[in-house]
From Swiss-Prot:
GO terms for cellular component: phenylalanine-tRNA ligase complex. This is Phenylalanine--tRNA ligase beta subunit. Residues 44-158 form the tRNA-binding domain. It is an enzyme of class 6 (ligase). It is found in: Cytoplasm. Its cofactor is Mg(2+). Belongs to the phenylalanyl-tRNA synthetase beta subunit family. Type 1 subfamily. GO terms for molecular function: ATP binding; magnesium ion binding; phenylalanine-tRNA ligase activity; tRNA binding. GO terms for biological process: phenylalanyl-tRNA aminoacylation. The gene is pheT. The lineage of its organism: Bacteria, Bacillati, Actinomycetota, Actinomycetes, Mycobacteriales. Coiled coil: none annotated. Residues 414-493 form the B5 domain.
Length: 835
């Protein structure tokens, strides 16, 4: 938002005539009370002669690629000065501003007489942008008739001794998007009396005699107030005076016509947007309603726009007059032949205005104010101020009729709910002892009504926020206002004492250990996005009842196509994999450790959460019940070569066994034993996927991904992945050091023939269970299929290591344990000993 320093000073000094502060000091004060000033722009200065002139003749020069005009300008010295100019937005008789040779413009450009386009040019006709009055480069600056006489000092006429502040107004401080709001802030900061420019003192109420225009409002539209007043008999050919045009230019708005200019001016002054309709183009009364499916509107920029049923419209009996709070329609736009206007001041729903203007890509100064909330108490004052300005500038008569729709039933006042606050709460929160009465003083300054109460419960204040401060909802908001206006610099910076170190928790230790061991195994960690692409589960082909489809939707997502919080880490890992592969990095191993969000069945509502006291146990339990479950997962993906090619061989592609090994190293560092069971679970390959168990508790899945899923993702074949729920894995603290037997081991091999449908893991588990405690380790080292084995069969060869903790094993001891393992495998999985 841009606002001139001179305009702020004018409004502030109404209540404090002796107040005088420089622009730089005012900037520091605004920053001190919490406003972000992005830039302080100096208007001008111009060094050298800058003169008002009147154009007396224009000759169009031909033979050039762009319009060139030889202009004769009278500057009151009795001479005719020829100046070459490329702008075409002025005519003979217009007042312009001329810079003569020897003048240096604000950007450092020096004016000199020169020969150009075959003619002599004795200076330059200036644009508003060249004088830093605005950023509009579309043409030269044309002054309204009667602004000054030719020969007048241009710097004095234009007011080139001003400063413009460019502020970034936060969403909760919509009241500051006006001179009214900022002037009040300045008065608070300097402890000045303040006269509200929207008060009856500043805007005397106009007479009211009857309804101006019938209006019907659908209650669901969220409109809080709608005021209408006609102004008849205006002269559309009139031009807004320079003082008004100047303030619009400095605020970043181009002057268009009196009807449009005064609505923009009052919006900047009071913060309440208005709209001017051509009354003679309105048929019947106004209705405020939602758009109908398929409905369109041609807005004042001449573009036909497709509406949505959530858009709010103003319509008459025939056509649409405006998109509420966003833009007017061409059908009721004021034009060059308009004589009667109907001024409208409405208070639209902030959320609906924000949604509509973003969807239609129609950002506007009005919409920026509506989406931050507009003061409904000043709608009629803004309307009357606008009507009187329009009548003064363009003639005409302000009608005594007024429509003021205030809701159904009509609302008598616009006060906000009162807030109770302990008088010393700001002191306790800031750790500062403020002067007695500081809290009451500061809250009164911002416009609140404060009632002081002393009772058995203590000294409290009942604070009713003003109608323009809907952001004040709870005691902490009031505390912020007191601290802000008293000065944050008085709050001491005290370094908090760190508690004695207690070390990492068991969960944190496991987190670090897993990350470390995966990194040592060649995996690279990424930070996964917490949001899911909307169509990812459809691409995976998950059934409709899959739990992973039950997601938590974010109301205001960072990206519209990612509205859901992730229930799995795999989509983010696969996206990272795609990004790497698309850049030619095809041998990749990635992992992530992060939380996923699993919604609960909670359907209750949560009210406002107090921040000025400790929550009760019941409130904490309610919050806990409403929160979705957020377990920590670890996931990894592998693509390309797991073992690189080189002089030693061609390398080895990643396969399902690498995924299983990743699970084992995670289990090993976590101090748990895992086993695998074959399962069908998308997005994994149905024949190359295993469910991972700790005891009888499933903790995740591992294996090779489904070829169709890989193809849809644009990845090469053979991608492997794991995902484990660490919250389901028991925490093992203080892992004991493994006992090392001093006795030698006995090594034996065993080959078993089983059906090809039997997973090797089940055979291995059967051998381990059957061999007993003497079996120290088992490794599968060979898989063989062929006619010698039999159809639909495979041979699995395991290396067995036997060792006793208290004696030296004999070959007979080891053979007996091996035979027991073979018998157990035969009973459990139908294995036979290969001979």
């Amino acid at each position: 938002m841009r606002v001139p320093y001179s305009w702020l000073c004018e409004v502030v000094t109404v209540g404090a005539p002796d107040w005088d502060v420089s622009a730089s000091d005012l900037k520091q004060t605004l920053v001190r009370i919490g406003h972000e000033i992005e830039e302080m722009i100096t208007v001008g200065p111009v060094d050298g002669p800058l003169t008002v002139g009147r154009v007396t003749d224009i000759e169009e020069l031909t033979g050039f690629k762009k319009p060139i005009r030889a202009c004769v300008v009278d500057v009151g010295d009795g001479q005719q000065h020829e100046i070459i100019c490329g702008a075409t937005n002025f005519v003979v008789g217009d007042l312009v501003v001329v810079a003569f040779p020897g003048t240096t413009l604000p950007d450092g450009f020096a004016i000199a007489a020169c020969e150009t386009y075959g003619r002599h040019s004795a200076g330059m006709i200036c644009s508003a942008a060249e004088l830093r009055l605005s950023t509009d480069h579309s043409g030269i600056l044309v002054l309204p008739p009667g602004t000054a006489l030719p020969g007048a000092d241009g710097a004095d006429v234009l007011g080139l001794d001003d400063v413009v502040f460019r502020l970034a107004i936060t969403p909760d401080r919509g009241y500051c998007m006006s001179v009214r709001g900022l002037a009040r802030e300045i008065a608070c900061a300097y402890d000045l009396a303040f006269v509200d420019p929207a008060s009856d003192q500043a805007v005397p109420p106009l007479p009211v005699g009857g309804q101006a225009w019938p209006v019907t409002v659908q209650p669901e539209t969220g409109v809080r107030r709608c005021a209408l007043r006609p102004v008849t008999g205006i002269d559309f050919a009139a031009v807004s005076p320079w003082w008004l045009q100047r303030r619009l230019l400095l605020s970043g708005i181009r002057a268009i016509s009196p009807a449009v200019d005064v609505t923009n001016y009052v919006m900047l002054e009071l913060g309440h947007p208005l709209h001017a309709h051509d009354r003679n183009r309105i048929t019947g009364g106004f209705t405020v309603r939602f758009a109908r499916p398929g409905e369109t509107i041609v807005t004042i920029d001449g573009i036909e726009r497709q509406l949505d049923p959530v858009d709010v419209l103003i319509v008459d009996n025939v056509t649409t007059a405006a998109i509420g709070g966003v833009m007017g329609a061409a059908s009721t736009e004021v034009r060059s032949d308009s004589t009667d206007v109907l001024l409208e001041a409405a208070v639209w729903d902030p959320a609906r205005v924000s949604h509509t203007q973003r969807r239609l890509h129609l950002p506007s100064e009005a919409a920026r104010r509506y989406e931050r909330a507009v003061d409904p108490a000043i709608s009629v004052a803004a309307l009357d101020r606008c009507a009187m300005l329009l009548a003064d500038i363009a003639g005409g008569t302000v009608s005594e009729t007024l429509t003021d729709w205030r809701g159904s039933p009509p609302r008598a006042d616009w006060s906000l709910p009162p807030i109770r606050i302990a008088v010393d709460l700001p002191d306790r929160i800031a750790g500062v002892v403020y002067n007695q009465g500081a809290t009451t003083k500061r809250l009164t300054q911002i416009g609140a009504v404060v009632v002081d109460t002393v009772s058995s419960e203590g000294h409290t204040l009942t604070v009713t926020p003003p109608s323009w401060r809907p952001d004040l909802l709870q005691p902490s908001d009031l505390v912020e206002e007191v601290l802000r206006l008293e000065g944050l610099e008085v709050i001491r910076s005290v370094r908090p004492l760190a508690p004695a170190g207690r070390g990492l928790t068991a969960v944190q230790k496991r987190y670090r250990a897993i990350g470390k061991v995966l990194a040592q195994s060649g995996y690279v960690e990424i930070l996964p996005t917490p949001f899911l692409p909307a169509d990812v589960f459809d691409l995976w082909g998950l059934p409709a009842d899959d739990p992973r489809r039950t997601t938590t939707r974010v109301l205001n997502p960072l990206e519209s196509n990612r509205p859901q919080l992730a229930t799995t880490l795999l989509p983010a890992l696969l996206e990272a994999l795609v990004s790497n592969v698309s850049r030619g990095i095809i041998d990749v191993a990635l992992f992530a450790i992060a939380q996923v969000v699993e919604p609960t069945e909670w359907t209750g509502g949560i009210g406002s959460i107090p921040v000025d006291r400790r929550l009760t146990d019941a409130e904490i339990a309610l919050l806990d019940a409403s929160l979705p479950r957020q377990p920590q997962h670890v996931a990894a993906v592998l693509a390309g070569l797991r073992e690189p090619r080189g002089p030693w061989g061609p390398g080895r592609l990643a396969e399902a066994s690498d995924a299983f090994e990743a699970v084992r190293i995670i289990a090993r560092v976590s101090g748990v034993d895992v086993f695998f069971r074959a399962v069908q679970y998308l997005p994994w390959h149905p024949g190359r996927c295993a469910e991972v168990f700790v005891g009888e508790t499933p903790i995740g899945h591992a294996g090779q991904l489904h070829p169709a899923v890989i193809e849809r993702a644009g990845l090469p074949k053979g991608i492997c992945a794991i995902e484990l729920d660490l919250a389901a894995m028991p925490i093992v603290e203080g892992l004991p050091a493994p006992q090392v037997s001093p006795f030698p081991a006995v090594l034996q091999d065993v080959s078993l023939v089983v059906s090809t449908q039997v997973p090797a893991q089940e055979v291995q588990d059967a051998i381990r269970d059957g061999a007993g405690e003497l079996l120290e380790d088992i490794q599968l080292f060979d898989v063989f299929t062929g006619s010698q084995i039999g159809e639909d069969c495979k041979s699995l060869t395991f290396a067995l290591r036997f060792r006793a903790p208290d004696r030296t094993l004999t070959e007979d001891d080891a053979s007996a344990a091996r035979d027991a393992a073979v018998r157990h495998a035969a009973e459990r999985v139908g294995a036979t000993l290969r001979t």
